[in-house]
Amino acid sequence: MFEIKNMLMTLAAAAIFCGCAAPQVQVQQRRRPVVPPPPPVTAVKIAEKITPDGKLDEKVWQKAPVYELKLVDSYRYYPPMEYARIRKDPYESARFRMVYDENYLYLGVEVDDSDVVCFEKKDQGDFYRNSDLLELFLWPEELSCYWELYATPSGLKTSIFYPAGGLSMIQYRDRSPLMPGFKVFSTVQGTLNNHSDTDKGWTTEMCVPLKVLAARGVPFKPGTKWRVLVGRYNFSKNLWKMQNSWFPVLPAFNFHYRSYYSPLEFK
């Protein structure tokens, strides 16, 4: 019994020694990028009548400040050689403005795009899977609900209403009806779905009916708190990988981080 006890003590001591002498393996954790507080986005109220046509050539648009989308570094965790190749591609930018009147919020976007594509044929599609796409997210801060709205270069559109971030997105993404009165008008500076030429880009106007937003309990007007995000999917035969961009910049690639959306200022 004494010999067995001594043997067990010897084994325990050896295990402790080995554990102390073994190299310490450190798990490399991904650092969360530090982003500044989101800058505000100003929506300018207009008295003039707007005729949406996807051209943005009306003088009323000049009243609104311009915001440029920033490239999303969504591939930074790719293998080094692949990531280096992706970063060689030029960034194709986009710029947006926001105005509103008594009936609609208007989002106007000018998009740089050397290969404009949209392969879907009807509204309420998952355009982010294969088509160039602009997305607008609208969130009334007092509520849990928010909207995700799509505009494509062909004028097709999608609207999704999420009652709350704590619910599964899948059922609402698949079953949401098109928002009544929601309109999209686009023009292409080039040719759609033609990889053999070089396009200049596309322009889009999104018209969001304010009465639909207000029906949830928060009117879209000065004195209320709204937050916004504008995002983009850029598919192209000229790019190594699809490009994403956004405004404002979020700490990670997820368009649904509402706490980081830009506060909306009414002017």
Describe each PLM feature range:
Residues 1-11:
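Bacterial N-terminal signal peptides that target proteins for export
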Residues 3, 19-22:
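Secreted/luminal cysteine- and crosslink-motif detector
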